UniProtKB/Swiss-Prot annotation:
This is tRNA pseudouridine synthase A. Homodimer. It holds the Pfam family PseudoU_synth_1. The gene is truA. One of its GO terms (molecular function) is tRNA pseudouridine(38-40) synthase activity. The lineage of its organism: Bacteria, Bacillati, Cyanobacteriota, Cyanophyceae, Synechococcales. Belongs to the tRNA pseudouridine synthase TruA family. Substrate binds at Y110. Its EC number is 5.4.99.12. SUPFAM superfamilies: Pseudouridine synthase (SSF55120). InterPro entries: PsdUridine_synth_cat_dom_sf, PsdUridine_synth_TruA, PsdUridine_synth_TruA_a/b_dom, PsdUridine_synth_TruA_C, TruA/RsuA/RluB/E/F_N. Disulfide bonds: none annotated. One of its GO terms (biological process) is tRNA pseudouridine synthesis.
Length: 268
């Protein structure tokens, strides 16, 4: 039995998230169906992050165990011939059986893209939130967001329906920058709560539009005022960029290799 890791890219617009569920098309379901065609038996997959419906991934990490003579590096080409064009395997490698796509990850990186331009742009419409009513003050947004760095209880930024035991997580870094009309919100954390990034972005946009102050933003999450956190950014602007491990298992470790070219600027 060997363990194979996949570097996966998908357009979340077409799927009801990563995780398999009844009466919905998900990325995990499609991927496991393709693996079944190869092996003729059920293969369970595990992902670094469980993206929600409509959320994209430029560098999702997945692993599965399989008893096969097919070398690990061959699965990328084999799977790409079976998968729809909205799911691509960028790389496949054999890894140690002790390595786990989820539990071995040191942190995950999500990026949210806001199109703050006056006019819509069809070429990025499905990968960004067109919030154009007011010019956003990204400096105010960054100042407010920096208070969340470190280990905190983010109960206010967790949608109902989560099965997590607690709402404490460690945010390693938050960066917000403007690249012309685009505002890029990058969050790196050891783990993310259900709907966390979209709720954070929804509140930060209110700060950027000066509808609420930084103090109000901070008060809402520090004092767990979940009922005051009502605005959630649309799913289409969110992308799971990658998961980082103590040892790189893929050759494609440069984000620029697989993140949409028009959204690369400002990557760190």
């Amino acid at each position: 039995m060997k363990r194979v890791a996949l570097l996966v890219q998908y357009d979340g617009y077409h799927y009801s998230g990563w995780q398999k569920q009844k009466n919905a098309t998900t990325v995990q379901e499609i991927l496991e169906s393709a693996l079944f065609k190869i092996t003729n038996h059920t293969v369970k997959t595990f992902a670094a992050g469980r993206t929600d419906a409509g959320v994209h991934a430029s560098g999702q990490v997945v692993h599965f165990d399989i008893d096969s003579v097919i070398p690990g590096f061959s699965y990328s080409n084999i799977l790409n011939n079976l998968l729809p064009s909205t799911i691509r395997i960028l790389e496949s490698v054999e890894v140690k059986n002790s390595w786990h796509a989820c539990y071995s990850a040191v942190y995950r990186h999500y990026r949210y893209v806001i199109n703050n331009g006056k006019f819509p742009n069809l070429f990025i419409n499905n990968w960004s939130w067109h919030r154009y009513q007011k010019v956003l003050d990204e400096v105010l947004m960054l100042h407010a967001s920096k208070t969340m760095e470190g280990e905190h209880d983010f109960f206010a930024f967790q949608k109902s329906g989560s099965n997590r035991r607690n709402s404490v997580t460690l945010i390693k870094n938050i960066d917000i920058k403007r690249v012309e009309d685009l505002i890029l919100v990058d969050i790196k954390a050891t783990g993310f709560l259900y709907g966390m990034v979209r709720l954070i972005v929804g509140q930060l946009v209110l700060v950027g539009e000066k509808k609420i102050s930084s103090d109000i933003f901070i008060d809402r999450w520090v004092n767990k005022k979940k009922n005051d956190v009502k605005e959630s950014a649309p799913a289409k602007g969110l992308c799971f960029v990658n998961a980082v491990y103590e040892e790189n298992v893929f050759k494609k470790v440069n984000n620029n290799d697989f993140f949409p070219l028009f959204l690369i600027n400002g990557f760190s």
